[in-house]
Regions:
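A structural signal for multi-pass alpha-helical bundles of membrane permease subunits
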Residues: 1-186
């Protein structure tokens, strides 16, 4: 239980923060329909963990194996939830998919605190986008990165809903988290 929980929390925290920052950078740029996209990507956060888990359980159990059989992809022909080795990845996918929304909002708010004149000065100095991000944007949003790292680590360490709805701690207790173990044993 401890090994799974820590492995899940470390992988989830890294994935959700990288994906959230990339999504926030995209949603903070000048694109058409930015407001609509910001509303759409937040939907996973509104849905309950059990509801999302049951939806993904159906996808992992029926839809992906059907696609795998039709396309002759041997890895997808069986449910990933039945695999002792890979079931944790399914739980991770669901957890990350649901957590990206809130972290993206925090990153967007951080990106909007960076003054435009700093970017104008870097453009005059000849900085490219990569240098601009690493030398200006990232250091200025570091407090928001810290907040997201702490919150996502806490949330991934407390994983419960996804375990209940996807695997009930199985197969062979390979996805049993600390919180699920406490629930199960009292």
């Amino acid at each position: 239980s401890y090994l799974f929980t820590f492995k899940y929390a470390i992988a989830g925290t890294i994935l959700v923060n990288v994906l959230s920052l990339l999504l926030a950078l995209g949603l903070n740029s000048n694109i058409k329909g930015k407001s609509a996209l910001r509303g759409i990507y937040f939907v996973p956060n509104i849905l309950g963990g059990l509801v999302v888990g049951y939806i993904f359980s159906f996808i992992f159990t029926y839809i992906l194996p059907a696609i795998g059989s039709a396309c002759h992809i041997s890895f997808l022909e069986n449910s990933i939830l039945a695999s002792e080795k890979y079931a944790w990845i399914a739980v991770l996918i669901v957890g990350v998919w649901q957590a990206v929304a809130m972290n993206t909002i925090i990153y967007i708010s951080g990106l909007q605190t960076v003054p435009e004149d700093v970017y104008e000065a870097s453009m005059l100095d000849g900085a490219n986008k990569w240098t601009e991000f690493w030398k200006i944007t990232f250091p200025l949003i570091m407090p928001f990165v810290s907040i997201n790292l702490v919150l996502s680590t806490k949330n991934f360490l407390m994983v419960f809903d996804q375990i209940v709805s996807l695997t009930q701690g199985g197969p062979a207790q390979s996805t049993e988290s600390i919180s699920y173990l406490i629930y199960k044993n009292g």
